[in-house]
C-alpha cells in the first residue's frame, strides 16, 4: 500500500510540474541506485544474501535499491529492491522493471553506468 501510494502521489506531483522545469517540453526523470546493508536475520539472508567474499556469520545481507524521481518536483516516482549479487540484480536489471513509468518523450538522466552501450532500455 505504501509503495502504491508513493507512486500515485509522485505521479500526481509530476503532472503538476511547472513548465520551466521541463527540458524542451519534456519531463526529466532521474534514475540512480545504491547498495544497503541490513540486519543479519534469517529472512534477510534468504532474500538478500551477504556477498560470498564475507565469511558466514560475519557479514550482513546486502540489497540493491534503484529509484526514479522527478527532476521538476523531487517526487519519488518508483523504486525497485533486489539482491546485491546474482543475475539481474544490478542497477540496469532493476531499472528495466521501472521503465513502465516512463512516457514517450520523457528524458532519463542517470550516471555513466546507464550509458553502457550494451544496455538497451527499449
Enumerate the predicted regions with their spans.
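Conserved, well-structured functional cores that handle cations and Mg-NTP chemistry
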Residues: 1-122
